[in-house]
Curated annotation (Swiss-Prot):
InterPro entries assigned: Helicase_ATP-bd (IPR014001), P-loop_NTPase (IPR027417), SecA (IPR000185), SecA_CS (IPR020937), SecA_DEAD (IPR011115), SecA_motor_DEAD (IPR014018), SecA_preprotein_X-link_dom (IPR011130), SecA_SF2_C (IPR044722)
Record field: catalytic activity: ATP + H2O + cellular proteinSide 1 = ADP + phosphate + cellular proteinSide 2
Spans traversing the lipid bilayer: none
Keywords: ATP-binding, Chloroplast, Membrane, Nucleotide-binding, Plastid, Protein transport, Thylakoid, Translocase, Translocation, Transport
Keyword Membrane belongs to the record: yes
Protein name, per record: Protein translocase subunit SecA
Any one of the GO BP annotations: intracellular protein transmembrane transport
Major enzyme class: translocase
CDD domains linked: DEXDc_SecA (cd17928), SF2_C_secA (cd18803)
GO molecular function per UniProt: ATP binding; protein-exporting ATPase activity
Subcellular location(s) of the protein: Plastid, Chloroplast stroma; Plastid, Chloroplast thylakoid membrane
Length: 882
């Protein structure tokens, strides 16, 4: 029934695809110049009230032809279906190697015709650069501008890239640019335009895996270094389960009564929780650093710095830091310099960032297991796109061992067998530590392998490792890094192998240290290289300062792409590349045939992840584009997933099993428990993300209001109206307090406050106001406000023309930013403490909304009052000559 429903859903696109092919028969006869003109014609149609869906067949036919002319690739029908699904604002689930990059360009072209811009979002800089280069190649045929955003760009460069028709960017840089734009002091510092349409590559990774991690821009904040060092010292003496308890599920630590008493004695204080000199947060962070955040698993140490490792991708997150003092506690634990703590200046979650878009869509190979969440939070439907060729991968049953030791032994034995028959094998591990453990075992068995994990020396070899992972006799150990954005080609990737051989050749010729080697350079390739004698001094590479590996790689790319080389030696180098490429194509083809006979790529999983999606991503490395392949998970009853979430059934099973440790367990109960454990974890984290979204929605509405006000001020060239508006609101608030007050002295004090605020010099007793009603007093004070402000404006204009406008904008932006930063701190404290309300039979979310609203109103009042006071009362010392 379900398959019938799915098939019908896809069948509705058949008429559109037929129409695309029909129009394509005409488009293929266009000259390059005629093809280029079609974009302008389609844009005119949109201006004349055509909607995008009406011109979809025509636009897709044009892109299809541009792709064919620029790359030689022909779009399959399933890719066109994927593009239609993206245009409709849905998620296209497409398997590895099915051409997601091309699918995004096709949809991007159609939606870019509105001239409002399209963002194509990737998970890392490498993919953004790679995909943008392909898009530029294609879009040069259809007169469309493609931009790329990188972290190192200037304001002007970013603005130009955002103003392009299609812009490639990473999810983190998009978020940080949004936050920076909303902290800009000048309007010309804003780089982004409106959020029109986004296509997210690896959409599940960004919208689900990273949903719990907010993007934060922070500023330095003074810290007490001695407290961190002392807390680390104390944490090392405390005993687990005696002095403190750990909840591994929630990653929380609680001190026991005995632990609290011990800490207070060691610190010689009466109260760990003393509001004026609190130690509790320092101690809890030190305990988390000791037991929950482990080196080579959650972070690595490089150049005396703690660098976070992303638990989902296995990649290092350079420049990111844990908040609330946790990062400093880990620095103290590792005995490296403790850096300043940070105060949050601006933040946003990915959930709310992507909900800013008018239309959102995404692509991934694994989203079906999370379709409920994607639908409920983002209103995105997941549609499975069939593969162009039937997937022939064989997913073998899990092998479960009693102990972790026996599991690793079995994996090593399997690798030994695969190596000796020549079958390429990829082993996926959950962290750096486990990948290095397996590496040591294989070294003892004298099995050659490639290791890919977050450590810098291995990351630098990523291209080389992935290039060869599908070759015969290749064993590759990898963390989750190999699970995203990479295609493992059986027999090897001839283009990448040729570039590596050429890089190695140039490094040798330039006398540079070769920090990596191909597993082996074939004899025929070495012969080709040795037959080419280059005069190195004639090469343009000598123009580069401090030649290194990156510059050599960039230089080779430039020569390969450039059809008209400058020098004869560079022409030789180009010919050498083509000769190597031709040879590697033969080698890789022969190897592919041999690997296919052996059963294709074999993927081994060493532990079930918290999410079935991550497991499916690893499996998806095998069986690319209809190739054969296989996957199998080797597990143990001591694995984290089973230990933390498995429940009592697993424990009982462990006690009752009396079989040999060497024998893998196959049990229906165990398989069900395994699936149940994974579903429990997924459900648990979904609830956390759902709750986070509900709470974050409150602050998001406040953020939108503050940022809208800030933008209004930035865009305004006449901020006087804004100051007057703020001052009038402040007068209204004070007048309301005046009428509520019964005490005469208090009333008199309130009137004095108004006079001070408005910088009025005349003493005015409130008795004279008795005969006036609220409206009359209000109008009188409004009039006094304008008179007072006119005088101040006139005075400052005489000192320096335009000074008052600059002052107004400065005070407005400064006070909004300062108040918002303080408000974020208060909201964080409220969020941490609001859970206790449930003990008083109150709904924490309802209470949070009420209190957050009160805090927001108080913040708005504070902004109005301080801006009014600063503008009306501040004394300026001005150097008129400067």
């Amino acid at each position: 029934m379900f398959n019938f429903f799915k098939k019908n859903k896809l069948n509705k696109f058949q008429n559109t695809i037929n129409e695309i092919h029909q129009i394509g028969n005409t488009v293929k006869n266009y000259s390059d110049a005629e093809l280029k003109k079609q974009t302008h014609k389609l844009k005119k149609k949109i201006i004349q009230n055509s909607n995008l869906t009406e011109i979809l067949p025509e636009s897709f036919a044009i892109v299809k032809e541009a792709i064919k002319r620029s790359t030689g690739m022909i779009l399959f029908d399933v890719q066109l279906v994927g593009s239609i699904v993206l245009h409709q604002g849905q998620i296209a689930e497409m398997k590895t190697g099915e051409g997601k990059t091309i699918v995004a360009i096709t949809t991007g072209y159609l939606n870019a015709l509105t001239s409002k811009g399209v963002h194509i979002i990737t998970v890392n800089d490498y993919l953004a650069k790679r995909d943008s280069e392909l898009a530029q190649k294609i879009c040069s045929y259809i007169d469309l501008k493609v931009g790329l955003i990188t972290q190192s760009m200037t304001y002007e460069e970013k603005k130009r890239a955002y103003d392009c028709d299609i812009t490639y960017i990473t999810n983190s840089e998009l978020g940080f640019d949004y936050l920076r734009d909303n902290m800009a002091i000048e309007f010309n510092q804003i780089v982004q335009r409106g959020f029109n349409f986004a296509i997210i590559d690896e959409v599940d990774s960004i919208l689900i895996d990273e949903a719990r991690t907010p993007l934060i821009i922070s500023g330095p904040f003074e810290i007490e270094i001695n407290k961190y060092k002392k807390s680390t010292s104390i944490a090392n003496t405390l005993q687990k389960d005696l002095d403190y308890e750990i909840d591994e599920k929630t990653k929380n630590i609680t001190l026991t009564e005995k632990g609290i008493s011990r800490c207070e004695n060691m610190l010689n204080i009466d109260n760990l929780y003393d509001i004026h000199d609190s130690w509790i947060q320092y101690l809890l962070n030190s305990l988390k650093a000791k037991d929950l955040f482990l080196k080579n698993q959650h972070y690595i140490v490089k150049n005396n710095e703690i660098i976070i490792v992303d638990e989902f991708t296995g990649r290092v997150m350079q420049g990111r830091r844990w908040s609330d003092g946790l990062h400093q506690a880990i620095e103290s634990k590792e005995n490296i310099p403790i850096q300043q703590e940070n105060k949050t200046l601006a933040s946003i979650t990915y959930q709310n960032l992507f909900l800013l878009y008018e239309k959102l869509s995404g692509m991934t190979g694994t989203a079906k297991t999370e379709e409920t969440e994607l639908d409920k939070i983002y209103n995105l439907e997941v549609l499975e796109i069939p593969t162009n060729k039937i997937c022939k991968r064989q997913d073998l049953p899990d092998l479960v061992y009693k102990t972790e030791y026996k599991k690793w032994q079995a994996i090593a034995d399997e690798c030994f067998d695969m190596y000796h028959i020549g079958r390429p094998t990829l082993i996926g591990t959950t962290n750096v530590e486990k990948s290095e453990l397996l590496a040591k075992i294989l070294m003892e068995l004298q099995i050659p392998f490639n290791l890919l994990n977050a450590k810098p020396e291995n990351v630098s070899r990523e291209a080389e490792i992935i290039t060869q992972a599908g070759r015969k006799n290749t064993i590759t150990i990898s963390t989750n890094m190999a699970g995203r954005g990479t295609d493992i080609i059986l027999g090897g990737n001839p283009e990448a192998l040729s570039k590596l051989a050429l890089t190695y050749y140039l490094q040798n010729k330039l006398g540079l240290k070769v920090n990596y080697l191909l597993n082996n350079i074939e004899t025929q390739i070495t012969t080709i290289i040795n037959n080419y004698v280059l005069d190195m001094q004639e090469l343009d590479i000598y123009k580069y300062k401090n030649i290194d590996l990156k510059k050599i790689q960039y230089y080779i790319e430039k020569i390969i792409k450039n059809e008209h080389t400058k020098y004869s030696e560079e022409e030789k180098l180009q010919k050498l590349y083509l000769k190597i490429l031709s040879e590697y194509k033969n080698i890789c083809y022969q190897e592919k045939q041999e690997v296919l006979k052996l059963g294709g790529l074999y993927v081994i999983g060493t532990e079930r992840h918290e999410s079935r999606r991550i497991d499916n991503q690893l499996r998806g490395r095998a069986g690319r584009q209809g190739d054969i392949g296989a996957s199998r998970f080797f597990l143990s009853l001591e694995d984290n997933l089973l230990r933390i979430f498995g429940g009592d059934k697993i424990s009982q099973l462990m006690d009752n099993l009396n079989i040999d440790e060497h024998t893998p367990i196959e049990s229906i109960i165990l398989s069900k428990s395994l699936d149940s454990a994974q579903k429990k974890v997924e459900s648990y984290f979904y609830d956390i993300r759902k709750q986070l979204f509900e709470y974050d929605e409150v602050i998001n509405n406040q953020r939108q209001a503050i940022y809208a006000e800030r933008k209004r001020i930035l865009q305004s060239s006449f901020t006087r109206d804004c100051i007057i508006e703020y001052a009038e609101s402040t007068i209204d608030e004070i007048l309301t307090a005046f009428y509520r007050e019964d005490n005469i002295n208090n009333k008199n004090h309130i009137i004095k406050k108004i006079y001070q605020l408005l910088n009025l010099t005349e003493n005015f007793h409130f008795n004279t106001l008795y005969d006036m009603n609220y409206k009359q007093i209000q109008e009188f004070l409004y009039e006094q406000l304008r008179i007072s402000y006119d005088l101040r404006e006139s005075y400052l204009e005489q000192l320096r023309p335009g000074l008052i406008r600059k002052l107004e904008k400065y005070y407005l932006l400064q006070q909004i930013d300062k108040a918002w930063q303080d408000h974020l701190d208060k909201m964080a404290l409220l969020r941490e403490s609001i859970g206790w309300r449930s003990y008083g039979q109150q709904d924490p979310l309802v209470e949070y909304k009420n209190e957050a609203f009160s805090l927001f109103i108080n913040m708005v009042r504070y902004i109005r009052q301080t801006v009014t006071y600063l503008t009306m009362r501040s004394r300026l010392i001005i150097n008129v000559n400067n």
